[in-house]
Amino acid sequence: MPSPFTRKFRSLLPGQQSELTIINADGTDRDVILAVDDAIIEAPNWHPGGDFLVFNAGGEIWRINVDGTGLSRIETGTIRDLNNDHVLSPDGRTIYLSNQSDGALYSVPIEGGTPTKVSNDHATPHHYYLHGISPDGTTLSYVAVEGPEGKKRVNIFTIPASGGPDTRLSDVSYPNDGPEYSPDGRWIYFSSERDATEPGHAQCYRMRPDGSGIERLSTSERVDWFPHISPDGTHCVYISYPRGTLGHPPDKDVRLMLMPSDGSWHREIIALFGGQGTINVNSWAPDSKRFAYVAYPVLN
């Protein structure tokens, strides 16, 4: 049966499908709750109420119950070019969205409705990619792609969730991505190539919310992206690419990894075919025992 995802910005490979999956943090009880072979679905968030996930497909935002029922689109008005960087407010009432075409941030009620622009207009290019929200719901953390073509830089910022001035937390030439607040608000977790000795060698880090006190959390030869902290603040799940990977592309043999919040050990949860879209945003369940991701297996 064809899926309802009629808008498509990126195509699956021949024989490939998108599998929205829930798994225990120890790698057990893997449950595919949605599988489609005609569309790319990406980047689940788990609603704080625990009953459903939200994800993006074809520039739109969708929701589905954790048992795989109740698939429906969340109305976002005139913004329908949404990428896979979105977060939910701690109270579960609002979803904050990154729109690809204009590079701006918006908020929409979780039930759907008219979007409200959160981000600012800039005299020079400043494309917003959203990743985190403070535990009190007042501040968003994001990366901005800044500068003209050929001189682009990716740095970390915060902005009030209700709109207001951007606050720069990094001003560097190497890539940074995925800034996400810890549940106690004391840290921002992120990925960076700040210590790379070869192109693309991103690792996991954390820093204080003012940009100080940077600590490295992974020291792998592999390429590690998007550390997502659990709601109880004890563990992170992140995605790990083979050495030599540039950025976080799709259609790669990757691993989902688990580490404690201080990075003192690292363990593989599951290996899969995926990458971009698999786990770009925080997808932990409220109980901190499970999380969601998308795999993209090629079946034939």
Where are the regions that the model predicts?
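Sequence signature of WD/YWTD-type beta-propeller architectures
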Residues: 1-300
